[in-house]
């Protein structure tokens, strides 16, 4: 009985430590809600690294109406985009990730791109974050197969005012935001899955017809 009590005490201390760390990080990353991007806004463009020396561009898949995609000749078809900011210290992110992965598996062959934007490195200088696990191996162990993009300096995080995590954005093929979410709470898994799936179906139905690539 005594051993069980000690074990429970240790677990409690560990959980409180994680919670305190997360609270400290969020406080250090104070945000201004007035700068939030809203549905109908044009999503800020970005280029983010996914491997050393290799970059993904939002404009490869989604661009303002009337403008061509970045690689129009080889990839002329607009896609809807789902992007979620996360960090390995973020506990609510760990609740959102399995749902995103399940939805991704359902739609990965459709005209919609899923991106996880990691800000772990951008927040590593905050006290307590020095030894956080790197996102790639961390997510691989959790069975996450979505594309990870690394916002190592937090530049894109600031453009999207995504300091409170997880922070999710959905946009159509014209880079117009159609859904935004901040945070994730236990018990909303079913609601989130339904909301995400319905919006994806709507966006896919509204995409323009496929075009042939011009090599």
Predicted regions and their residues:
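Hydrophobic beta-strand anchors of alpha/beta hydrolase catalytic cores
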Residues: 82-83, 114, 168
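A generic structural motif
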Residues: 61-64, 163, 184
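N-terminal targeting signals for export/organelle localization
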Residues: 1-61, 179-181, 212-215
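Aromatic-flanked redox-active Cys/Sec active sites in thiol-based oxidoreductases
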Residues: 84-90, 118-120
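Thiol-/selenol-based redox modules, centered on thioredoxin-like
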Residues: 170-215
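Structural microenvironment flanking redox-active thiols in thiol-disulfide oxidoreductases
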Residues: 94-141, 152-159
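A short beta-strand-turn-helix
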Residues: 47-81
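Structural micro-motif
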Residues: 143-147, 161-169
């Amino acid at each position: 009985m005594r051993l069980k009590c000690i074990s429970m005490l240790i677990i409690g201390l560990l959980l409180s430590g994680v919670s305190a760390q997360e609270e400290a990080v969020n406080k250090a990353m104070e945000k201004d809600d007035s700068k939030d991007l809203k549905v109908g806004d044009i999503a800020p463009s970005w280029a983010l690294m996914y491997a050393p020396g290799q970059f993904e561009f939002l404009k490869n898949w989604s661009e303002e109406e009337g403008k061509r995609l970045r690689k129009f000749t080889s990839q002329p078809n607009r896609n809807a985009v789902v992007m979620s900011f996360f960090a390995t210290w973020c506990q609510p992110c760990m609740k959102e990730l399995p749902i995103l992965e399940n939805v991704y598996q359902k739609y990965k062959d459709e005209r919609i791109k899923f991106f996880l934007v990691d800000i772990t490195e951008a927040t590593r200088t905050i006290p307590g974050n020095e030894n956080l696990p790197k996102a790639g191996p961390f997510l691989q162990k959790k069975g996450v197969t979505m594309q990870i993009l690394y916002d190592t300096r937090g530049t894109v995080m600031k453009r999207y005012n995504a300091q409170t995590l997880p922070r999710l954005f959905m946009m159509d093929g014209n880079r117009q935001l159609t859904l935004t979410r901040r945070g994730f709470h236990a018990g909303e898994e079913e609601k989130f899955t339904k909301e995400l799936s319905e919006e994806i179906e709507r966006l896919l139905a509204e995409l323009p017809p496929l075009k042939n690539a011009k090599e």
